[in-house]
């Protein structure tokens, strides 16, 4: 493909997919054992050597932070053999949080081209998958005392206000126009539905633009049908419901905003297809634009490199922080970049520590850029191809908050499509996430555990 053919003329910068290659190629494999959390199965896939030159390091993590860890030698294991190992971890508390076990194999000594302490294998799995995430989340009467949501509707706008916030919607197109917390507007453009991604090299090769182009402007061209306001009798919840028609797709879309007296906003999107036969969707989600100052991104999800539905096993779930510009990878030809899968929450903050927290009701796909999608999208027959290194920062943070993002494929680079299990079929879909303001005193991880709806 383009990336491979260009390797001889590129600087020695690793592409993000190398970490998935490393994971798939690893010669030490770890598996959970049914009905126990402490026992694991280790398989040595080497053809000739044992594992005496490697150390096993284990870590139990919650909210991206280690709460237990240890190190041990592997048992004596011949090539192509398996063994069971007991990890000496303590019981996992039933506190409603997610706990993950991460297993890593490191070299004990230096070898040609391989330093001592080099990670040669990694695996991670959740220890309490049956536990409900955010089970311990509560909101108390004390937090809501003397706080209400006030509403106002004019011919041009719907406005919701509270003690330290103001949220406004245009009645002309249903878009959120203000998200003010403590006098600062956190948006330059409000949430809009988005079904398109900047085409990857594999997308171009399999005629994705011709096959799925109906989705490119589906969100932008959505026609407002109605916008309604409802508030409960004690002013503890205000709801704005926006209904759209996707005319070319013969489908409908509903976005519901629920607002609590503390300024927390739950956003729910509901897509319903009609009878028209439609191709797969490149992505299913929403996007918004924030001021450029909110350029420090922290997320609890897979990382730190970009990853996708069919390319994510080499990127453990963890707590990561980077600038928004660091999310961008300069491929030879500019294209989709920076996606993170299985994101529990993401925070975008300015240098003062203020910003916005997004928490998914289910794990999200999230990406953030310093430019609009159009800057990296593929333009057919454009003689001036955009080199990844030519993309420039703009005065913005483009934030994608997706329920689904299709895989990248790659069985070959001359026509193979993404496997069906990693595509997005246009049936009925709905998802939700919550937005909350962050002060410089707020711990984003702890605030993400609050449940306001």
Label each PLM-derived region with a short phrase.
Residues 68-70, 118-123:
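Extracellular and select intracellular beta-sandwich modules with Ser/Thr-enriched
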Residues 55, 98-102:
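Short, conserved beta-strand segments of beta-strand-rich sandwich/propeller modules, principally
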Residues 79-80, 117-119:
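Glycine-centered loop/turn motifs
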Residues 105-114:
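Short acidic/polar inter-strand loop motif in beta-rich domains
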Residues 1-82, 86, 91-93, 363-398, ...:
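Substrate-binding clefts and catalytic carboxylate motifs of secreted carbohydrate-active enzymes
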Residues 88-96, 111, 126-453:
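Beta-strand/loop-rich accessory regions of lumenal/periplasmic or secreted enzymes
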Residues 39-46, 87, 101-105, 164, ...:
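Buried hydrophobic-core signal for structured, non-transmembrane domains
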